[in-house]
């Protein structure tokens, strides 16, 4: 069983065991009317938009430094991030909905709930905890699930980042007319990363969509490798969590977009 299949099976068990219903019952609803739109930010921003991530660990990384997360988010906003991603998976990524709830009030930036969503109930919990965006991973959803979850999230006034890893998944994302598409440079089945994967997937991209390159971006040289693919932004986690000088590092990544 791949790590991804294992994670999805775990999410299914949480749904069956009432985990998400319990979260709905115990989490206070967070009002986030002051959140900005990430899509609006992308459309207005001549430079790459940055989704800066809060993460504690992953199936491949266990040595991320502990940070004052409120300060981390404050620094993300101060030094040019356009959105914040917060992992809410507890078992594999060390996150939680409680963390999302606590941190979303620390910023006016859009906040992405990054998790493995397979059911509308998870979207309800994400919204109640204060997310303004959710992630949908094409690889773990049928076409019907993808369409239904996408439409449900939009109906809840949430923005949706649809994540793809190959060209077939990109075509599936186009079918739901996704405005925001993330290209994951990490193969979630093997957890192997190649930042230039973005170039391959976006060779025949369609216009009128916004593209985010995710995973494997460690410095400005990585960004330059994929800049001419026509990306609109980057999702960066590990490099930012390891960085001790965000005031210099974050602005270096916000390069001028190159539109082909």
Curated annotation (Swiss-Prot):
Coiled coil: none annotated. Its EC number is 4.1.1.48. Gene3D superfamilies: Aldolase class I. GO terms for molecular function: indole-3-glycerol-phosphate synthase activity; phosphoribosylanthranilate isomerase activity. It is an enzyme of class 4 (lyase). Pfam families: IGPS. Pathway: Amino-acid biosynthesis; L-tryptophan biosynthesis; L-tryptophan from chorismate: step 4/5. It comes from the Bacteria. GO terms for biological process: L-tryptophan biosynthetic process. It catalyses: 1-(2-carboxyphenylamino)-1-deoxy-D-ribulose 5-phosphate + H(+) = (1S,2R)-1-C-(indol-3-yl)glycerol 3-phosphate + CO2 + H2O. Keywords: Amino-acid biosynthesis, Aromatic amino acid biosynthesis, Decarboxylase, Lyase, Tryptophan biosynthesis. NCBIfam families: PRK00278.1-3. Belongs to the TrpC family. This is Indole-3-glycerol phosphate synthase. It comes from Staphylococcus aureus (strain JH9). The gene is trpC.
